[in-house]
Amino acid sequence: MRLHDTLHAAKRVFSPKNSERVGVYVCGPTVYDLAHIGNARSVVVYDVLFRLLKALYPEVIYVRNITDVDDKIINATESENKSIAELTAHYTKLFHEDIEALNCLSPTFEPRATEEIETMLHIIGRLIQAGHAYVRGGTVYFSVESYKHYGALSGRKLGDMISGSRVEVVAEKLHPGDFVLWKPATDLDMKLGACWPSPWGVGRPGWHVECSAMSYRYLGDSFDIHGGGADLMFPHHENEISQSCCAFPGSEYARYWVHNGFLTVNGGEKMSKSLGNVITVRGLLSNGVDGEVIRYVFLSTHYRKPLDWGDKAVLDAKEALNKIYRSCEGFSAQLLSTGLEDVGVHDAVMASLRDDMNTPAAIAALHELVKEINKTNNAGEKLRLARVLNKSAMLMGMFRNFPERKLLDMRGLVDEGEINRLIEKRVEAKKCGDFKLADEIRESLSNMGIGISDGKDGSTRWHRKN
C-alpha cells in the first residue's frame, strides 16, 4: 500500500512499525455545534483508511479524539446557558448519530480531552525539564526555536510564520511563534469548571498538547499514521510534532502524515456562518439526502483534492447509485450477503485503494463490474459478480442496506418534496440560462422514474413512469 505523506511531500510505501499492529490517530471533532460536511468528509476519508488497513493487517488501533474543552466550547456553554458536560455530551451524541448515518465504523478508542489532563501535565513537565518550554505568569509556552525542525511539515520558515494571521504576538513570549501549552484559568473558566490544578497554577491545556497527550496515551510516543484535514496542518499538526518529538527524544511521533483536502460549497465558497452557507450533515439527512449519497459524493473525489459540494454532485451520486442498485435488483440482500467468504474484493478496487486511497478509481471499477453484471445472461455468474460487487463496495463502507430498501427508494418511491425541489431548481436554471444543468436535472428525475413536461405558460408538470 502507498500513502501520500505530507511530511515528505510524496507517495510512500506504507511500512508500519509492527506489521501485526498498526496505529492510527486522527483529529476528531470539537463538540460545540452540529457536524458540517467538511467535518464529515474527514471522518469518511479515515473510515475508508481504517477499513482498508483492517483488510490488510491483523490488528488496527484507530484513535479519534473528542475535544471537549476549548474557547469555542466555553463560549457556546455561556451563550446556551448549559454546563460544559451537558453541551459536549449533547453534541457528541449528535455527532455519533450523524456519522452512523454515513456508515462510519466506531474507532477503537475515542478519548475525550478532559479525561487525559494528567497525561498532558506529564508531557508539559517533560518539556519544561528539557528546556523546550518555559513559564510566564502561570502560562506555559513551547519554545519553537528550541526545535530545529519546526516548520518541516507545513514547509514554512520560522521567520515567515511570525507575520501569519494565526500567530498571536504576546510580549511575554520569547519568540512570537511560541504557543501555549497551559493557560491560567479565567473567571469564566472557574465558573464553568473548565480548569484543573497544575504545578503552574489552576488552568487548562492549550489545544495542541491535547492531541499529543491522547495519541501518546493510546499509541505510545511513536505510531504509524496521523490523519486530519489540510486546515490542521499549520499550526496544529506542526505544533504536535514539535512538542511530541521534544518531550520524547528519539521519537519520530507519526511515521506518515495524511491530510484530506478542503471542502467548499456553491462553486468554491468557503463555508462560513457569516455567509449563511454552512451545510450540516443533519440538515442534509433531514432534507431527504440519504447517508449513502453523502458518502458517495465524498468518495467520488480523491481525498487529497478539493471537493465542491452542490446540487449537481448530489444528483450525480443518486444517478450513479441507482445504476448500481438496478444491476442487482433481482437478488435479495440475504442472497447477496451469503457466500461472501468465497469471493474476493475486485482486483481493480483493491489496487485503487492501495494506491493512496484512490476512491474515484475504485468507484469506476465498481461501475465496470455493473456493466459485466448487466451483460451476462448466466444466472450463476451474475450472482457471483453481484457478490463481488457487494464485497468490494463494503470495503469502502457502501451498500449497508443493499439492495432491497435502496432499490425501492430509487425506483419510484421518491419523496414529492424532493421532486418539487428539483423541478424548482430546474426552473431557476432555465431562467438563468443554465440549460445544461436543467437537462441534467431532467435526466436525474427520469432515472428516478419521474417524467416531466413543460407547458407553454412556463409551468412544469411531473408524473411517475410506469
From Swiss-Prot:
InterPro entries: Cys-tRNA-ligase, Cys-tRNA-synt_Ia_DALR, Cys-tRNA/MSH_ligase, Rossmann-like_a/b/a_fold, tRNA-synt_1_cat_dom, tRNAsynth_Ia_anticodon-bd
Cofactor: Zn(2+)
Subcellular localization: Cytoplasm
Highest taxon of source: Bacteria
EC category: ligase
One Gene Ontology term, aspect cellular component: cytosol
UniProt keyword annotations, A-Z: Aminoacyl-tRNA synthetase, ATP-binding, Cytoplasm, Ligase, Metal-binding, Nucleotide-binding, Protein biosynthesis, Zinc
Keyword Protein biosynthesis: yes
GO biological process, alphabetically ordered: cysteinyl-tRNA aminoacylation
Coiled-coil annotated spans: none
Complex formation: Monomer.
NCBIfam families, sorted: cysS
Name the UniProt record assigns to this protein: Cysteine--tRNA ligase
Native species: Anaplasma marginale (strain St. Maries)
Primary gene name: cysS
